[in-house]
């Protein structure tokens, strides 16, 4: 299994269990998230409550919770939305911090295509949700989420060059 860690914070943000598509010449990865139900385990122990005088489901009060699989798996923390000015300030700082960690062809590809990726994100800014890794590190990568038109499940966007592949 491969896990993708944030190069700046070390937080685990994604794994190969979630297939991705490259956007903007590979600068962004697009990953489909899914709403899943967590909790509310229905255990059939083979007893017949009506024969035993039991009432309607006197078992444990088990609460079902709907969560997004990627958010839950990697313990992503939702952040307040950015306005355009805040987003541009974040992107400038992020690019500066990330380029210090990149070398060679990876650095060249990032520098060449990050502007178009930034414009792509800016075009969706009003529809984006913002998530950071579990450590909530100020300079870490932000994971962006949005809902495609008519979609019930969110789509996540990652800066590919900000992820480090780690084998587990």
Swiss-Prot record:
Involved in calcium binding and microtubule stabilization. This is Translationally-controlled tumor protein homolog. One of its GO terms (cellular component) is cytoplasm. PANTHER family: TRANSLATIONALLY CONTROLLED TUMOR PROTEIN-RELATED, TRANSLATIONALLY-CONTROLLED TUMOR PROTEIN. Pfam families: TCTP. GO terms for molecular function: calcium ion binding. Residues 1-168 form the TCTP domain. Keywords: Calcium, Cytoplasm. The gene is TCTP.
């Amino acid at each position: 299994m491969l896990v993708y860690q944030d190069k700046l914070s070390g937080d685990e943000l994604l794994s190969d269990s979630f297939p991705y598509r490259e956007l903007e010449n590979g600068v962004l990865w697009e990953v489909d998230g899914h709403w899943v139900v967590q909790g509310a385990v229905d255990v059939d122990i083979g007893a017949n409550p009506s024969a035993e005088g039991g009432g309607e489901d006197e078992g444990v009060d088990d609460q079902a919770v709907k969560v997004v699989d990627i958010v839950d798996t990697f313990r992503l923390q939702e952040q307040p939305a950015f306005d355009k000015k805040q987003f541009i300030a974040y992107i400038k700082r992020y690019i500066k911090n990330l380029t210090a960690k990149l070398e060679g062809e990876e650095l060249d590809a990032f520098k060449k295509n990050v502007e178009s990726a930034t414009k792509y994100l800016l075009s969706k800014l009003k529809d984006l949700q913002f998530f950071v890794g579990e450590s909530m590190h100020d300079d870490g990568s932000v994971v962006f989420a949005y809902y495609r038109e008519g979609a019930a499940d969110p789509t996540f966007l990652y800066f590919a060059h900000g992820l480090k592949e780690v084998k587990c």
